[in-house]
């Protein structure tokens, strides 16, 4: 007879990444397993570290602006907005109303583009191949608008400290209206494919649960927090760029599982369209740049500004020593904070669920490692 200890369960350590397609970047996850059950995880980050915050200390305020696009490169517009708002707060200036309105339109369009890439790749990770083609089809239309506006599709560098560099092109407003009209039926189309699909629901429902209290404990923000039932969105709670003028809802769920995070992001895309429609119909006339000198030299002081990026609260802490270069720039990236909750979400689950949970965190390693 074989030794019975051969059949006893033993702990297995499995390396997932850093080169793994479902981590969407160079993330290494060390999984401790008992058969198919996950006993714990340990995330190893830093493979994409570029020293962005240190680079800021050796650049002028304007020179550092393009660097922030390279953190969450999927939502570069939001990164640029947060940075510009922080430096504008240091300077005690405000972008003109026209610039603020255009900023809102482009930021919400970028939110949709970010969520589309998340949805397509998340579905692909789980085994649904069709949605990624549909999502990339609509995302391409959004990227075309960015390209026509500023010449870039991904790392746009669309905003400037004090406002905008570029005025809208002829037909910009109509293209935004056409996109909004086209896009809402497409979201319904995605939901027809996935929301009530038995396989999709089976893979996501009651998987990776994170309660509201646990979200607060970890400092989790964005769709992950709202899926747990916490109605917190900085566009409503601490309005910036004129968001208080727009009528929109904050989508929330109650279970805090992987399925609820999917539902929240789907509804967020609809709300982004709603904001864009109101903004494009109310673009005021006027200048697109505030009273900012060619040489940006804020007075000695500090400022912190946070915005609602597609992945959660994105914050910039800027310290000025009175020179043309920042003394310190500190970034509070939502992906970095949200990733800390991964172990709590996966522990006790199955190894097959790891990919699904990482997918609904919607992390970008450029933002985490900086």
UniProtKB/Swiss-Prot annotation:
Protein localization: Cell inner membrane
GO cellular component: plasma membrane
Family annotation (Gene3D superfamilies): Cytochrome-c3 Hydrogenase, chain B (1.10.645.10)
Keyword NAD: yes
Keywords of the record: Cell inner membrane, Cell membrane, Membrane, NAD, Quinone, Translocase, Transport, Ubiquinone
Pfam families assigned to the protein according to its UniProt record, in alphabetical order: Complex1_49kDa
Highest taxon of source: Bacteria
EC number: 7.1.1.-
Keyword Acetylation assigned: no
Annotated protein name in UniProt: NADH-quinone oxidoreductase subunit D 2
Organism of provenance: Solibacter usitatus (strain Ellin6076)
Lineage: Bacteria, Pseudomonadati, Acidobacteriota, Terriglobia, Bryobacterales
